[in-house]
């Protein structure tokens, strides 16, 4: 599976929230199916995510700038929440 292609497809066909604040709110509301964080995501935020046992957290191998680019955005994205993957197979990472 090409992670970047699956991520773009989820953004295009599903419901994906970008940013730490939106991601934290999505977790709090219990709507997130999966969280993706950049490798350079702040450690305090990552610690908070690791305490959430009910949602899978995937660490993207690139920086927040690279994650933003993978999302098709011209800005940094350190965290995102996948609420609905749409036609993407990205949620299959939870089973891997």
Curated annotation (Swiss-Prot):
Keywords, in A-Z order: Ribonucleoprotein, Ribosomal protein
Gene3D superfamilies named among the record's database cross-references: 3.30.1330.30
Matching SUPFAM superfamilies: L30e-like
Any one of the GO CC terms: cytosolic large ribosomal subunit
UniProt cross-references to Pfam families, sorted A to Z: Ribosomal_L7Ae (PF01248)
GO molecular function, one term: structural constituent of ribosome
UniProt xrefs under InterPro entries: Ribosomal_eL30 (IPR000231), Ribosomal_eL30-like (IPR039109), Ribosomal_eL30-like_sf (IPR029064), Ribosomal_eL8/eL30/eS12/Gad45 (IPR004038)
GO terms classed as biological process: translation
NCBIfam families assigned to the protein according to its UniProt record, in alphabetical order: PRK01018.1 (NF002172)
Family as reported in the entry's similarity comment: Belongs to the eukaryotic ribosomal protein eL30 family.
Protein name: Large ribosomal subunit protein eL30
Gene encoding the protein: rpl30e
